[in-house]
Protein backbone atom coordinates (compact mmCIF):
# COMPACT_ATOMS: atom_id res chain seq x y z
CA UNK A 1 0.00 0.00 0.00
CA UNK A 2 2.11 2.95 -1.27
CA UNK A 3 1.06 5.68 1.15
CA UNK A 4 4.02 6.38 3.40
CA UNK A 5 6.09 9.39 2.38
CA UNK A 6 9.83 9.13 1.96
CA UNK A 7 10.17 12.03 4.40
CA UNK A 8 7.94 13.90 6.80
CA UNK A 9 6.76 17.39 5.92
CA UNK A 10 8.01 20.15 8.16
CA UNK A 11 5.34 22.59 6.95
CA UNK A 12 2.29 20.43 6.29
CA UNK A 13 -0.06 23.33 7.06
CA UNK A 14 1.49 25.61 4.44
CA UNK A 15 -0.75 24.26 1.69
CA UNK A 16 -3.81 25.06 3.76
CA UNK A 17 -2.85 28.68 4.17
CA UNK A 18 -1.51 29.12 0.63
CA UNK A 19 -4.52 27.56 -1.06
CA UNK A 20 -2.77 25.07 -3.36
CA UNK A 21 -1.79 21.50 -2.64
CA UNK A 22 1.47 19.94 -3.87
CA UNK A 23 1.07 17.50 -6.76
CA UNK A 24 1.96 14.43 -4.70
CA UNK A 25 -0.64 15.35 -2.09
CA UNK A 26 -3.34 15.91 -4.72
CA UNK A 27 -2.49 12.52 -6.24
CA UNK A 28 -2.67 10.84 -2.84
CA UNK A 29 -6.09 12.32 -2.04
CA UNK A 30 -7.46 11.30 -5.44
CA UNK A 31 -6.64 7.69 -4.57
CA UNK A 32 -8.84 7.85 -1.45
CA UNK A 33 -12.64 7.51 -1.42
CA UNK A 34 -14.42 9.45 1.32
CA UNK A 35 -18.05 8.55 2.06
CA UNK A 36 -20.56 7.39 4.67
CA UNK A 37 -20.68 3.81 5.90
CA UNK A 38 -23.19 1.85 3.83
CA UNK A 39 -22.98 -1.74 5.14
CA UNK A 40 -22.62 -3.75 8.34
CA UNK A 41 -19.21 -5.03 7.24
CA UNK A 42 -17.99 -1.46 6.75
CA UNK A 43 -19.25 -0.43 10.18
CA UNK A 44 -17.49 -3.40 11.78
CA UNK A 45 -14.27 -2.64 9.88
CA UNK A 46 -14.41 1.00 11.00
CA UNK A 47 -15.07 -0.06 14.61
CA UNK A 48 -12.18 -2.52 14.43
CA UNK A 49 -9.84 0.22 13.17
CA UNK A 50 -10.90 2.48 16.05
CA UNK A 51 -10.31 -0.29 18.58
CA UNK A 52 -6.91 -1.14 17.09
CA UNK A 53 -5.67 2.45 17.09
CA UNK A 54 -7.13 3.25 20.51
CA UNK A 55 -5.54 0.14 21.99
CA UNK A 56 -2.13 1.37 20.77
CA UNK A 57 -2.65 4.56 22.77
CA UNK A 58 -4.13 2.96 25.85
CA UNK A 59 -7.59 4.43 25.27
CA UNK A 60 -9.41 1.10 25.73
CA UNK A 61 -9.25 -1.18 28.75
CA UNK A 62 -8.81 -4.97 28.64
CA UNK A 63 -12.34 -5.54 29.94
CA UNK A 64 -13.93 -3.69 27.02
CA UNK A 65 -11.61 -4.94 24.30
CA UNK A 66 -12.58 -8.60 24.02
CA UNK A 67 -14.72 -8.06 20.91
CA UNK A 68 -11.87 -6.11 19.23
CA UNK A 69 -14.34 -3.54 17.92
CA UNK A 70 -15.07 -0.14 19.44
CA UNK A 71 -18.81 0.51 19.52
CA UNK A 72 -21.08 2.22 22.03
CA UNK A 73 -24.82 2.35 22.54
CA UNK A 74 -24.80 5.61 20.57
CA UNK A 75 -23.84 3.68 17.44
CA UNK A 76 -27.25 1.99 17.60
CA UNK A 77 -29.09 5.29 17.14
CA UNK A 78 -30.38 5.88 13.59
CA UNK A 79 -29.10 9.47 13.56
CA UNK A 80 -25.52 8.42 14.27
CA UNK A 81 -23.41 8.53 11.10
CA UNK A 82 -19.99 7.01 10.49
CA UNK A 83 -17.71 8.39 7.78
CA UNK A 84 -14.85 6.44 6.23
CA UNK A 85 -11.79 6.86 4.04
CA UNK A 86 -11.10 3.91 1.73
CA UNK A 87 -7.91 3.07 -0.14
CA UNK A 88 -8.26 0.11 -2.52
CA UNK A 89 -11.49 -0.89 -0.72
CA UNK A 90 -9.78 -0.94 2.68
CA UNK A 91 -10.84 1.46 5.43
CA UNK A 92 -7.84 3.54 6.50
CA UNK A 93 -9.66 6.31 8.36
CA UNK A 94 -12.96 6.92 10.12
CA UNK A 95 -14.88 9.40 12.26
CA UNK A 96 -18.39 9.23 13.73
CA UNK A 97 -20.99 11.96 14.30
CA UNK A 98 -23.39 11.42 17.22
CA UNK A 99 -26.29 13.91 17.31
CA UNK A 100 -27.73 14.78 20.71
CA UNK A 101 -30.76 12.77 21.82
CA UNK A 102 -32.54 11.79 25.05
CA UNK A 103 -29.50 9.55 25.62
CA UNK A 104 -27.23 12.59 25.47
CA UNK A 105 -23.77 12.30 23.93
CA UNK A 106 -20.76 10.28 25.16
CA UNK A 107 -18.88 13.22 26.68
CA UNK A 108 -21.86 14.02 28.94
CA UNK A 109 -20.17 11.55 31.28
CA UNK A 110 -17.61 14.20 32.27
CA UNK A 111 -18.88 17.48 30.75
CA UNK A 112 -22.62 17.29 31.42
CA UNK A 113 -22.92 20.71 33.11
CA UNK A 114 -21.13 22.50 30.28
CA UNK A 115 -23.16 20.72 27.59
CA UNK A 116 -26.41 21.39 29.44
CA UNK A 117 -25.46 25.07 29.39
CA UNK A 118 -25.23 24.91 25.59
CA UNK A 119 -28.54 23.06 25.41
CA UNK A 120 -30.23 25.79 27.47
CA UNK A 121 -28.96 28.29 24.90
CA UNK A 122 -30.88 26.38 22.24
CA UNK A 123 -27.79 24.86 20.67
CA UNK A 124 -28.40 21.64 18.75
CA UNK A 125 -25.40 19.51 19.56
CA UNK A 126 -23.58 16.61 17.99
CA UNK A 127 -20.42 14.97 19.26
CA UNK A 128 -17.49 14.14 17.00
CA UNK A 129 -16.30 10.74 18.14
CA UNK A 130 -14.15 7.72 17.30
CA UNK A 131 -11.67 9.40 14.98
CA UNK A 132 -9.00 6.93 13.88
CA UNK A 133 -6.46 6.64 11.08
CA UNK A 134 -4.26 3.66 10.22
CA UNK A 135 -1.07 5.03 11.69
CA UNK A 136 1.10 2.19 10.38
CA UNK A 137 0.64 3.59 6.86
CA UNK A 138 2.23 6.92 7.69
CA UNK A 139 5.13 6.15 10.00
CA UNK A 140 5.10 6.17 13.78
CA UNK A 141 6.01 8.89 16.23
CA UNK A 142 5.29 11.75 13.86
CA UNK A 143 3.11 14.62 15.06
CA UNK A 144 -0.05 14.75 12.94
CA UNK A 145 0.41 18.41 12.00
CA UNK A 146 3.81 17.54 10.46
CA UNK A 147 2.59 14.76 8.18
CA UNK A 148 0.68 16.22 5.26
CA UNK A 149 -0.86 12.97 3.97
CA UNK A 150 -2.16 11.95 7.37
CA UNK A 151 -3.28 15.51 8.10
CA UNK A 152 -5.22 15.87 4.88
CA UNK A 153 -6.77 12.44 5.29
CA UNK A 154 -8.19 13.66 8.61
CA UNK A 155 -9.19 17.02 7.14
CA UNK A 156 -11.09 15.40 4.28
CA UNK A 157 -12.94 13.12 6.70
CA UNK A 158 -13.88 16.21 8.71
CA UNK A 159 -14.86 18.04 5.53
CA UNK A 160 -17.33 15.29 4.66
CA UNK A 161 -18.71 15.33 8.20
CA UNK A 162 -19.01 19.14 8.15
CA UNK A 163 -20.94 19.09 4.88
CA UNK A 164 -23.26 16.37 6.13
CA UNK A 165 -23.87 18.35 9.32
CA UNK A 166 -24.33 21.74 7.64
CA UNK A 167 -26.55 20.69 4.75
CA UNK A 168 -28.41 17.57 5.90
CA UNK A 169 -29.07 18.21 9.61
CA UNK A 170 -30.26 21.00 11.91
CA UNK A 171 -27.17 20.69 14.12
CA UNK A 172 -25.64 24.03 15.11
CA UNK A 173 -22.71 23.04 17.31
CA UNK A 174 -20.13 20.26 17.27
CA UNK A 175 -18.50 19.14 20.50
CA UNK A 176 -15.56 16.85 21.09
CA UNK A 177 -13.48 15.49 23.97
CA UNK A 178 -9.85 15.13 22.93
CA UNK A 179 -6.52 14.33 24.50
CA UNK A 180 -4.74 17.62 25.30
CA UNK A 181 -1.89 16.70 22.95
CA UNK A 182 -4.31 17.10 20.01
CA UNK A 183 -5.43 20.59 20.99
CA UNK A 184 -3.47 22.32 18.20
CA UNK A 185 -5.21 20.33 15.47
CA UNK A 186 -8.66 21.39 16.65
CA UNK A 187 -7.63 25.01 17.16
CA UNK A 188 -6.48 24.96 13.55
CA UNK A 189 -10.01 23.81 12.60
CA UNK A 190 -11.62 26.66 14.61
CA UNK A 191 -12.74 24.59 17.58
CA UNK A 192 -12.87 26.67 20.78
CA UNK A 193 -12.36 25.66 24.40
CA UNK A 194 -15.44 24.59 26.34
CA UNK A 195 -13.91 23.11 29.51
CA UNK A 196 -10.52 22.18 30.87
CA UNK A 197 -8.68 18.94 31.45
CA UNK A 198 -10.45 16.08 33.21
CA UNK A 199 -9.93 12.35 33.61
CA UNK A 200 -12.07 10.47 31.07
CA UNK A 201 -13.11 7.02 32.36
CA UNK A 202 -14.52 6.17 28.93
CA UNK A 203 -11.02 6.55 27.46
CA UNK A 204 -9.32 4.34 30.06
CA UNK A 205 -8.86 7.31 32.41
CA UNK A 206 -6.76 9.30 29.96
CA UNK A 207 -6.92 13.11 30.19
CA UNK A 208 -9.39 14.99 28.00
CA UNK A 209 -10.32 18.57 27.20
CA UNK A 210 -13.68 19.70 25.80
CA UNK A 211 -13.91 21.79 22.63
CA UNK A 212 -16.81 23.09 20.54
CA UNK A 213 -17.32 24.44 17.04
CA UNK A 214 -20.20 26.72 16.06
CA UNK A 215 -20.86 25.77 12.44
CA UNK A 216 -22.00 29.22 11.31
CA UNK A 217 -19.30 31.08 13.23
CA UNK A 218 -16.61 28.71 11.95
CA UNK A 219 -17.39 29.64 8.35
CA UNK A 220 -16.97 33.33 9.18
CA UNK A 221 -13.78 32.69 11.16
CA UNK A 222 -12.38 30.64 8.31
CA UNK A 223 -13.12 33.44 5.85
CA UNK A 224 -11.50 36.03 8.10
CA UNK A 225 -8.42 34.00 9.01
CA UNK A 226 -6.78 34.39 5.58
CA UNK A 227 -6.23 30.65 5.31
CA UNK A 228 -7.27 30.23 1.70
CA UNK A 229 -6.65 26.50 1.58
CA UNK A 230 -8.90 25.79 4.55
CA UNK A 231 -11.60 28.08 3.17
CA UNK A 232 -11.55 26.36 -0.21
CA UNK A 233 -11.60 22.89 1.33
CA UNK A 234 -14.24 23.44 4.00
CA UNK A 235 -16.44 26.19 2.54
CA UNK A 236 -16.16 26.64 -1.22
CA UNK A 237 -15.77 22.99 -2.17
CA UNK A 238 -18.89 20.86 -1.68
CA UNK A 239 -18.92 17.13 -1.09
CA UNK A 240 -20.50 15.16 -3.91
CA UNK A 241 -24.03 13.82 -3.25
CA UNK A 242 -22.90 10.23 -3.76
CA UNK A 243 -20.43 10.57 -0.87
CA UNK A 244 -23.37 11.07 1.50
CA UNK A 245 -25.86 8.74 -0.19
CA UNK A 246 -27.02 5.26 0.85
CA UNK A 247 -26.21 5.78 4.53
CA UNK A 248 -26.57 2.50 6.39
CA UNK A 249 -29.90 1.85 8.10
CA UNK A 250 -29.47 -0.69 10.87
CA UNK A 251 -31.83 -3.65 10.43
CA UNK A 252 -33.15 -5.76 13.32
CA UNK A 253 -30.53 -8.38 12.43
CA UNK A 254 -27.80 -5.73 12.51
CA UNK A 255 -28.91 -4.50 15.93
CA UNK A 256 -29.07 -8.02 17.34
CA UNK A 257 -25.68 -9.04 15.96
CA UNK A 258 -23.78 -5.85 16.81
CA UNK A 259 -25.30 -4.88 20.14
CA UNK A 260 -26.65 -8.09 21.67
CA UNK A 261 -24.29 -10.79 20.40
CA UNK A 262 -21.03 -9.10 19.41
CA UNK A 263 -20.69 -6.48 22.17
CA UNK A 264 -23.46 -7.20 24.71
CA UNK A 265 -24.24 -3.47 24.81
CA UNK A 266 -28.01 -3.99 24.75
CA UNK A 267 -28.14 -6.49 27.64
CA UNK A 268 -26.01 -4.07 29.70
CA UNK A 269 -28.26 -1.07 28.93
CA UNK A 270 -30.92 0.39 31.21
CA UNK A 271 -34.62 -0.07 30.57
CA UNK A 272 -34.86 3.66 29.84
CA UNK A 273 -32.16 3.44 27.17
CA UNK A 274 -33.84 0.47 25.53
CA UNK A 275 -37.21 2.27 25.55
CA UNK A 276 -35.65 5.16 23.63
CA UNK A 277 -34.19 2.77 21.08
CA UNK A 278 -37.61 1.15 20.68
CA UNK A 279 -39.02 4.61 19.93
CA UNK A 280 -36.31 5.09 17.30
CA UNK A 281 -37.28 1.83 15.60
CA UNK A 282 -41.05 1.51 16.23
CA UNK A 283 -41.54 -1.34 13.74
CA UNK A 284 -38.76 -3.52 15.18
CA UNK A 285 -39.47 -6.40 17.57
CA UNK A 286 -37.04 -5.64 20.38
CA UNK A 287 -37.81 -8.80 22.35
CA UNK A 288 -36.25 -10.73 19.48
CA UNK A 289 -33.37 -8.27 19.14
CA UNK A 290 -32.60 -8.49 22.85
CA UNK A 291 -32.94 -12.26 22.98
CA UNK A 292 -35.46 -14.53 24.68
CA UNK A 293 -35.86 -13.86 28.36
CA UNK A 294 -34.09 -10.49 28.30
CA UNK A 295 -34.65 -8.39 31.39
CA UNK A 296 -35.79 -5.57 29.10
CA UNK A 297 -38.70 -7.50 27.66
Model-identified regions with their sequence ranges:
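Extreme N-terminal leader/anchor segments
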Residues: 1-14
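Short amphipathic alpha-helix that is part of the acyltransferase structural core
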Residues: 2-4, 20-71, 79-84, 91
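Short acidic (Asp/Glu) patches
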Residues: 63-80, 104-117
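Glycine-rich phosphate/pyrophosphate-binding loop shared by adenosine-nucleotide-utilizing enzymes
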Residues: 90-94, 126
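Acyl-donor binding region in acyl/amide transferases
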Residues: 101-107, 111-217
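Accessory, usually C-terminal, subdomains that scaffold auxiliary metal cofactors
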Residues: 198-259
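C-terminal non-catalytic accessory extensions
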Residues: 265-297
Amino acid sequence: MPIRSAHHDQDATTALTAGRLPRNLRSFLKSITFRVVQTRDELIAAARLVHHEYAKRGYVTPDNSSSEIKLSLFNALPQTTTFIALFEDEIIGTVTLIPDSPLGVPMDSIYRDELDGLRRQGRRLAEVSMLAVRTDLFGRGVFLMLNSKKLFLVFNLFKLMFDYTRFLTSITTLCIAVHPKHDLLYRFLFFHDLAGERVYPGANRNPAIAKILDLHLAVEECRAANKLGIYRLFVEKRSKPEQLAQKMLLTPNDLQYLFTEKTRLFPQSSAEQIRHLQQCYPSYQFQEILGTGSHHS
